[in-house]
């Protein structure tokens, strides 16, 4: 049976699995309110689905159309937007924002105040450190051409992204790659490599004892 704090809001139709906890002031199943100028789709979204044993922490928001697997932790004041698919055993840290149409693989950890932009893919066992910023729009809001080209980064299995790094639109971080703190990633990162700097460049291989 799910536990919902009296101050939490769970919108009609939301599916809560066995042992789910929705803590103080959290909101689950919220339909988005769009700006008149928004290019996002406007049809009603299906209910949010929250898997067994998942915790939606104090002040967190999970929008309608989101699907969270089992044993997920959504930290205090974090936000998971519509059409996000989160696999089992994922941690979304305090104040992190996962934008719409994003996929997050099992056991991935997104730490406090990270920003995962819309149309991103994070595979299994990814680590995203605090205050990482991902982007998806090379045109920065100008021209209609941007709508067809809008794409967040793809972060492959076991890759790690250091604190404060910035990932530019559409780039791919390869399997088991390591992006150093504060790096600005403007092009694809090869699998198993360490990149640092602005713009990011390959420094060396990831040590074997750090590989999954």
Identify the role of each PLM range:
Residues 2-196, 201-202:
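Structural signal for interior beta-strand "rungs" in well-ordered beta-sheet cores
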Residues 206-212:
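A glycine/serine/threonine-rich, flexible loop-to-helix segment
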């Amino acid at each position: 049976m799910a536990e919902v704090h009296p101050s939490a809001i769970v919108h009609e139709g939301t599916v809560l699995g066995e042992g789910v906890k929705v803590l103080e002031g959290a909101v689950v199943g919220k339909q988005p309110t769009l700006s008149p100028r928004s290019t996002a789709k406007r049809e009603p979204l299906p209910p949010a689905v929250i898997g067994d044993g998942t915790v939606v922490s104090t002040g967190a928001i999970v929008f309608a159309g989101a699907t969270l697997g089992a044993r997920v932790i959504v930290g205090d004041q974090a936000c998971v937007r519509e059409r996000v698919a989160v696999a089992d055993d994922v941690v979304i840290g305090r104040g992190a924002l996962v934008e719409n149409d994003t996929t997050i693989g099992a056991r991935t950890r997104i730490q406090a105040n990270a920003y995962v932009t819309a149309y991103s893919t994070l595979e299994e066992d990814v680590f995203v450190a605090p205050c990482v910023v991902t982007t998806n729009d090379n045109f920065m809001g100008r021209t209609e051409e941007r709508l067809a080209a809008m794409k967040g980064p793809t972060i492959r299995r076991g890759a790690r992204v250091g604190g404060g790094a910035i990932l530019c639109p559409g780039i791919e971080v390869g399997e088991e790659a390591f992006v150093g703190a504060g790096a600005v990633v403007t092009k694809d990162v090869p699998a198993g490599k360490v990149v640092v700097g602005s713009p990011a460049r390959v420094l060396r291989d990831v040590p074997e004892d750090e590989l999954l």
